[in-house]
């Protein structure tokens, strides 16, 4: 009340005038009253009315050519009849700043006119017009960096924002001075009235904010659409490296990475594997006509189909992450297709070779990779051979083959744990899981084949080496991949490698014994149950060296079993060999159980992370929608 009295005194001209005019309005009844014959109010009324009705329009017309819109910062309760009630967030149209009282403006808010204190509203800074656009460009810029899908969408939206924000400003400046025309324009503008009735800048800001979340929501929806294709890796890979994420959003466009790693890649790789497998099978057929070509061809086909299945999820797992990798890995033609997702360093390519093309590819591709290493490794392998000493020269040769080929693989596998840590683990997890399923699916029929043909064992030894080589390279790489999957440092990964290596080392001894056992399958039937890994180590070795002189190397193993049958008949202790094989089998089963546990744990972690990310995305989407809806409702209430 004190404020109102203080304000009334300086505003005696305005407020007292209004009050006296109201009093005179009360006197209207007194005009017809015979007790009050005073005529003085009559002649005085026109000037008052004229001062109110005719004096203010000129001011209004003077200022309305550039109408200003202010936003109310604080609530204001009117204390006089001519004051305007303000609510926080309302938009006030300033009709005149030249009132009789300093610090008071005349304006219109929600269809009511009146005066209000100027410090209750926020003046529109002219510079702020550009801020929303800059904010939009800044918000879209970081989106462009991590996501290359955004440049197409963000640029047009920025242009739309520019046009949208400039549109209202043009409409604002082109308004006619008359009040009715303003009302008409505001009504005609409909939902766009928010621009004309309430700050052209703030709606622009709202649009910018609403459009950028929409962009994000579109991209997130696309990512969710692609997430079933990408499998869990989508959830994990954004965190490890953001160089990968920029290339991910194209994945929805590429779908199962059809553009980046074209479908021909998936097709030619089988073709290459088949052709190379045929090459490998040709020497096999030349050395021994026992091996029918169909035996080898189906195995490549078998390998092709599961690996294609594996390759499709792999390629879709990290389609764009491998773009950088594909270029270095393409030299290794075959496995760059199916293994490229798991590769982020060329050393990793050396491991996938057995995985990818264990049949015939393993021979040429591995040799390309390993030939520089074979000389050193053969030196070390010969040391190992001397360490393992076997009486017969054939045994030594065979051990050389085994060790020379186990050690390259083992050393490569030992190298690989160092290379993969930069690789996002999720891709390798998926690879490991895919290959585990393949190993389980492939090894059982192959063991059945092994058990089914004991009599024709010498003849089948060569196809089965390749078949088992497929199972082993798949299983061995799965070990390699699981170690990086757990994101263990190389020190932790190497112990696993060392667990495999001792078993490989034992396999070198016992694979020789196996070779002794395998030829006379009639005598030693239980040996056919030897786990695929052991044989695969033995047979992984064959495809590696054959290319230089494939006929000789393949012929040697075929001759060695016959000599071994003679040696065995001369007195090899079969029971000790069985015991060793059993111990090896148990160790391998333990490893398999452990790896399965780890895989299940990793799979559960990935599932939980996937769910968490989906929840977060849903929350973000809901939050953006909630934040958008009140603004939209608010602008609509202001326009009407």
From Swiss-Prot:
Could you tell me which Gene3D superfamilies the record lists for this protein?
SH3 Domains
- Biased region (Polar residues) positions are 210-220, 621-640
**SMART domains from the entry?**
SH3
Q: Which UniProt keywords apply?
A: Coiled coil, SH3 domain
Task: Kindly list any coiled-coil regions of this protein.
Answer: 572-626
Where is the segment annotated Disordered? 1-60, 133-361, 401-551, 618-640
Here the segments flagged for biased composition (Basic and acidic residues) are 177-186, 401-416, 459-469, 494-532
Q: Where is the SH3 domain?
A: 65-126
Q: Does the keyword Cell membrane apply?
A: no
> What GO biological process term is on the record, naming one?
actin filament organization
Provide the protein name. Answer: SH3 domain-containing protein 21
Identify the species of origin.
Answer: Homo sapiens
Taxonomic lineage? Eukaryota, Metazoa, Chordata, Craniata, Vertebrata
